[in-house]
Amino acid sequence: LSTDHDKLSPDVLAMLSEPETVLYISTESVRELIVAYNNKGLGNKEWKTAEDMVHSIEETYYLEILPVQKEVMYTYSRLRINNTQNHRDPSDHVIISHAMTLKMPLISSDTRFDYYRKQGLVLIFNEK
């Protein structure tokens, strides 16, 4: 949840600034943010609690939180893991599966995600 435009590539910034662009976030990403907040790895002066942060995701950042449906778990169960780059993060795999199942593009700066394009991931790479 960065408002630091230096962390976004010009292409991603342009896409995000389009008025008709609707932004979504997986419940798995929200879960990761809550864990980071509770472990003091994520902070913001405006958030007093993790719940405040979740409200901010929707109300300040205008992201729609998408629940993980069982169909996502079927995609996840079939996902071939990027062992070449030792990509073993199960949360990343759920987020990738979520995007693939819903046929939605995924914005990420993680170079390991490119591997999943051949399985159906539509990746918008954010080159920092």
Where does each model-flagged region fall?
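Acidic donor-binding loop at a coil-to-helix junction in glycosyltransferase catalytic cores
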Residues: 90-91
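Active-site-proximal, substrate-binding regions of enzyme catalytic domains
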Residues: 37-64, 71
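Acidic catalytic patch
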Residues: 27, 58-83
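Short, well-structured N-terminal submotif of metal-dependent ribonuclease cores
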Residues: 1-26, 41-52, 128
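Acidic, PIN/NYN-like endoribonuclease modules and their adjacent C-terminal/linker elements
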Residues: 94-128
